[in-house]
UniProtKB/Swiss-Prot annotation:
Claim: Cytoplasm is one of the keywords in the record: yes
Name this polypeptide is given: CDAN1-interacting nuclease 1
Location in or out of the cell: Nucleus; Cytoplasm
Pfam families found in the cross-reference section: TPD (PF14811)
Main localisation: nucleus
Organism expressing this protein natively: Bos taurus (Bovine)
GO biological process: erythrocyte differentiation
Length: 281
């Protein structure tokens, strides 16, 4: 789904001060019925992550952490079965999984002899049964499963969806009888930064030569696309030549402005691929 900047801004404006819940996503779908659920979820997640980055610091002051921890303790003393942490996160407009991390780290600092390592905290967030306090373990679990933008469950889902779309792209390339090298093969040859697929014989798409294809199982907004251009796409272009990026959940139309320089954007696998044959001397 390709959106104009104005269409995207209209959706983004509806997400201001909206909690990251499945109920909010359902309301968004009702407001924009012509947009796919996957596209709206991707935009929803990206906009919320921008909000969290803007407000992250205020939740990590020593005063804020102590206030949250005391509110958590008071809440579970009254009713340990109530979703105290989840409600606290929603009240202060912070991601439930990130709130769970703050409280877990504060708990471990108090009850363990040595400061908790990041790997220990990550392991406990992935498997709350490792947390030595049953009430806190349940509170953390509630935060993880009810967070649709952050946390180990979301990370797992995103990884699986990304892999699924890479497999889809591979199948489409094979269906078109296009010869390619994938990321693993390229790294085995010593390349450190590679697109998902390098075409061994370049193709033409809409009159543009394509040497590589990158799969992105997300919506291409300004923030993410400019970061990808800087960190990935221009590096690919510099090393391998012009290429194609597929944003499977759509992108902002105005971002497709580097075609003449050698980076095309698509929201699906192109249907008008022309295979270029090597000339025989």
């Amino acid at each position: 789904m390709i959106l104009t900047k104005a269409q995207y801004d209209e959706i983004a404006q509806c997400l201001v001060s909206v909690p990251p819940t499945r109920q909010s996503l359902r309301k968004l779908k009702q407001r924009f019925p012509s947009q796919s659920q996957a596209t709206l979820l991707s935009i929803f997640s990206q906009e919320y992550q921008k909000h969290i980055k803007r407000t992250h610091a205020k939740h990590h002051t020593s005063e804020a952490i102590e206030s949250y921890y005391q509110r958590y303790l008071n809440g579970v003393r009254k009713n340990g079965a109530a979703p105290v942490l989840l409600e606290l996160a929603n009240e202060v407009d912070y991601a439930p999984s990130l709130m769970a991390r703050i409280i877990l780290e504060r708990f471990l600092q108090k009850h363990e002899e040595a400061p908790p390592s990041k790997s220990v905290i990550n392991s406990m967030l992935r498997d709350p049964s490792q947390i030595p306090d049953g009430v806190l373990a349940n509170q953390v679990y509630q935060c993880i499963v009810n967070d649709c933008c952050y946390g180990p469950l979301v990370d797992c889902i995103k990884h699986a969806i990304g892999h699924e779309h890479e497999v889809l792209l591979r199948d489409l390339l094979l269906e078109k009888n296009l010869s390619f090298l994938d990321e693993d093969q390229l790294r085995a040859r010593g390349y450190d930064k590679t697109p998902d697929f390098i075409l061994q014989v370049p193709v033409a798409v809409e009159g543009h030569i394509i040497h590589w294809i990158e799969s992105k199982a997300s919506f291409g907004d300004e923030c993410s696309h400019h970061a990808y251009l800087h960190d990935q796409f221009w590096s690919y272009w510099n090393r391998f030549g012009p290429g194609l990026v597929i944003y499977w959940y759509g992108f902002i139309q105005e971002l497709d402005c580097n075609r003449e320089r050698g980076i095309l954007l698509h929201a699906c696998f192109p249907t008008d691929i022309v295979t270029l044959c090597h000339s025989v001397a």
